[in-house]
Amino acid sequence: MDAEHLKRLEGREAEHIPDILNEFNKKHADLLVFDSFHSDNQWHELWLAIFGILDDAQLGHLHTQCLNTVRILTRDEFSLQTNYIEHEVSQLLRLARVEASSLKLPATPDELKQQEEGQLQLQEQPSLAQSDIIAEALKCLCNLVYQSADCRRQCLRQHCLDAILKRVASSMRHPCALEYYDMKLLFLLTALEPAARTRLQIDLNGLTYMTKWLDDKLAEPSCSEEQLNIICELLKVMFNVTSAPDKSPNEYEIQSLHLTGVLRELLLRFGKMATDKERSVVTHAINLLTNISSSCLIELTLKCSNAEEQPKKAVEGVAKAKPAKCCALCFEKRNVRCLTVLLNYLRQALAQQEAEASSHELLSPVLTVLVKCSRSDRVMRHYLRQEILPPLRDVSQRPEIGQELRNHLCRFLTLPAMILRDLAAELLFVLCKEDVGRMIKYTGYGNAAGLFAKRGILDCRRVEGADYSSDSEDSDTEEYKKHQQGINPVLGCVEPKSKHNPLDDMTEEQKESEALQLVNLIEQLRQGGIVKPALIDKDGKPQPLEHILQLQEELPQQQLEQKRKT
């Protein structure tokens, strides 16, 4: 900006300001590098000139343009760090109406509603022009909070959280843009400032207010794309707040039960994921569920509405009669639509991962939630097992080959990505009720060996402390029973018969020579640090050997001890 334009801004020449700011804002709309503004203190002079205009109430019609310029200037981290801007930040907080030095927020949304009813005549609905100014000021504050720790602390000192939360919880309707940037600012503060999370959750009871607001949003007959964006930002804020709960366990669990019920309604409403935005809402809801206590996830599956009205029909002579369903997605008298949404989301995420070779960020949260559901409730585990590990029929292919959920999860068992590998292993193991034999049946010992080594059950011992119902869920199909004897437990499938065994044509001397060569090759790999030969110790975990020949001494004794145990 040339000196003449800057001088006119400093002189607050109203007739020239709109053209000057319009030209500047268009020219620098995408500016990210401000090196040219650092010479001759140009950034600071322009900053002060703009805030001089913002301080003049008579130039209120220019404030939206001025704030657009401020938003551009707040991208310059260097200038924000090297100039004293506390007064200007206070001015932005005032323009955004999030400065609340003496605000007292009621403990619950109901108390706030009563307070608003008593002050109905004192409330002032912002005009459209004022709402635009508030939204632009919020955009500037978002940039400042992202760039500067000092600005974040100033926002907390001036009770910015209190004011935003009161506006969110107010019965007064606000434009979507204003609500969106309220949530964006709240997200940045809670993501970057731990003290903000603590204050929002403990001092302001923010989770209760935000849960109520989310519930109100879902009660509306339709949701525009702008409303879906707001819901996404709100879910992100709630994720930050619940990441490290500081409330007492009982108090937090009561809030979590209510929140889980609201998230259930959200998943049911947007579970079809008809648009990318609806899919984003489901993604953020699943992320939030990862922070919810396992004991609260029972709220995802309510009793079917007419389950109690179903007549009890005793079927004599039929040991495994299926209970009558009272609705389309009723399983053991519980509505499992939410679990169906989670499984559909998992299938879509798996398809996306294969098509785009994307990261595992979409898969880890939904697998975490499925693990927690499986561990927390018998009915949920039964349903997930039915969908993920149905009774085996085709055992001609390895478990990791195919496009079913079981096949995908078995492939994850041998991934180098530890988080995804461990989550897939835990989900499958829990669905197998932590039964080693059942896990081998569905995955093959080779795929599950990593889990067994980690758990200390390589020798297929029973897992201690596993607490599951004694009812049998495992019914072998006729196809499985037919081929059961021919299944290779290491591969997890029927091993194709070899046309010719090369050892058949060897003499005993040749076999011994081949065995010695194999020993030498394994020893070379061991010396190079590529492999580590091991035996299973008394704890069921692999114990490295100093030399490959130790196998010759230790293995027969270990096999003898294993036979005695069985």
Curated annotation (Swiss-Prot):
Keywords, in A-Z order: Cell projection, Chaperone, Cytoplasm, Developmental protein, Guanine-nucleotide releasing factor, Synapse
One Gene Ontology biological process: protein stabilization
This protein's GO CC annotations: cell cortex; cell projection; cytoplasm; presynapse
Pfam families: Ric8 (PF10165)
Gene Ontology molecular function: G-protein alpha-subunit binding; guanyl-nucleotide exchange factor activity
InterPro entries referenced in this protein's UniProt entry, alphabetically: ARM-like (IPR011989), ARM-type_fold (IPR016024), Chaperone_Ric-8_A/B (IPR008376), Gua_nucleotide_exch_fac_Ric8 (IPR019318)
Subcellular location: Cytoplasm, Cell cortex; Presynapse; Cytoplasm
Family the UniProt entry places it in: Belongs to the synembryn family.
Reported function: Chaperone that specifically binds and folds some, but not all, nascent G alpha proteins prior to G protein heterotrimer formation, promoting their stability and activity. Also acts as a guanine nucleotide exchange factor (GEF) for G alpha proteins by stimulating exchange of bound GDP for free GTP. Plays a key role in asymmetric spindle positioning, a step for asymmetric cell division that generates cell diversity during development by activating G(i) alpha protein independently of G-protein coupled receptors. Required during gastrulation and sensory organ precursor (SOP) formation.
Subunit organization: Interacts with GDP-bound G(i)-alpha protein. Does not interact with G-alpha proteins when they are in complex with subunits beta and gamma. Interacts with Frq2 in a Ca(2+)-independent manner but does not interact with Frq1.
Name of the protein in its database record: Chaperone Ric-8
Species assigned in the record: Drosophila pseudoobscura pseudoobscura (Fruit fly)
Originating gene: ric8a
